[in-house]
Amino acid sequence: MQGTPYIYQGEEIGMTNAYFKSIDDYKDIEAINAYKEYTESGLMTEEEMLNCLKMVSRDNARTPMQWDDSANAGFTTGTPWISVNKNYTQINAKAALEDKDSVFYYYQKLIRLRHENEIIVEGVFHGLLEDNDDIYAYERTLGDEKLVVACNFTNKEVPCDLFEGKEGEELITNYKNHVTGVPVSYTHLTL
């Protein structure tokens, strides 16, 4: 995988989609027009269209930055142009900085690894387990070095023998005490 990584619109603290419950919560004219078009034509029910917008609306990335658990997530003392995500009391910059296992610090570790390991930037990409629908895995090679990455984006632990019997240094994982398989929502880099 080539390219420049970027961290965008609250991802560094784990901000999520807003999942607005009413079309009145949306401000994006594209979302509002699509809602009207699809519901009035009968192509989708109001509920189906709202479920679609919860996943794809640009307004998901336009909610105010969640700085802390105070009113309006610490973004403003006024009225924001769009509603603050309802999870701001749990997901916010202040809470992230106070939790050494937060998404924020995980991103910092990943950025540090990228700066310290040329293989992450310059290594040749090879897909692994390409027939496995549950695990996204690949390796990068650079000279004699090999970096293996395994990611499980499912909601269940998945059996995997990718690392079995192999020596290497675990560079980062978001699960500390796993025994077998690839845990739920798991990322693992081994050099």
Residue ranges and their predicted role:
Residues 1-147, 153-158:
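Loop/helix patches that line or flank the sugar-binding groove of alpha-linked glycan CAZymes
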Residues 178-186:
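Short, intrinsically disordered, charge-balanced linker/junction segments flanking boundaries
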Residues 187-191:
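Conserved small/polar residues in nucleotide/adenosyl-binding loops
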